[in-house]
């Protein structure tokens, strides 16, 4: 299993976090620590080849116990095909979780807004 580390960058002045090329068979997406500089609200885009998999955005305050993030309408941030959601999050950590499917290769791109 390969660990997929989040990549942090500033794109056009906006903080962005990415996990690229996640597969269910070989990869573990690592957590991202949310700080004041990296936002309190944001949008997430799921893209790539899903191959029957489901991608969910999760949060945790201890980095061990994870729960699904809800969007602004209270719906779980989860997709089986290319999708985009807006969310707020005050948890200490966030990460994507890819389950099921095969022959998948998914990118997760988050733009964070807040105190930066």
Features from the language model and the residues they span:
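Generic structural motif
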Residues: 4-8, 55, 108-110
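Extended, low-complexity, turn-rich repeat/linker tracts enriched in Gly/Pro/Ser/Thr and Asp/Glu
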Residues: 46-54, 100-106
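Beta-sandwich interaction modules
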Residues: 30-37, 70-116
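Conserved Ser/Thr-centered positions that define the repeating blades of beta-propeller domains
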Residues: 58-60
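Residues that flank catalytic or metal-binding motifs in active/ligand-binding sites
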Residues: 40, 53, 92
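Surface-exposed loop/edge segments in extracytoplasmic proteins
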Residues: 16-18, 64-72
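Transition segment at domain starts
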Residues: 1-38
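A short beta-strand element within beta-rich, extracytoplasmic domains
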Residues: 38-49, 96-98
């Amino acid at each position: 299993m390969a660990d997929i580390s989040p990549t942090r960058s500033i794109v056009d002045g906006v903080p962005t976090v990415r996990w690229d090329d996640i597969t269910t068979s070989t990869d573990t997406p690592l957590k991202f620590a949310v700080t004041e500089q990296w936002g309190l609200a944001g949008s997430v885009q799921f893209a790539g080849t899903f191959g029957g998999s489901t991608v969910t955005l999760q949060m945790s305050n201890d980095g061990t116990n994870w729960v699904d993030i809800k969007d602004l309408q209270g719906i779980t941030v989860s997709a089986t095909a290319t999708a985009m959601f807006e969310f707020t999050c005050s948890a200490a950590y966030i990460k994507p979780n890819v389950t099921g499917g095969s022959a998948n290769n998914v990118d997760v791109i988050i733009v964070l807004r807040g105190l930066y």
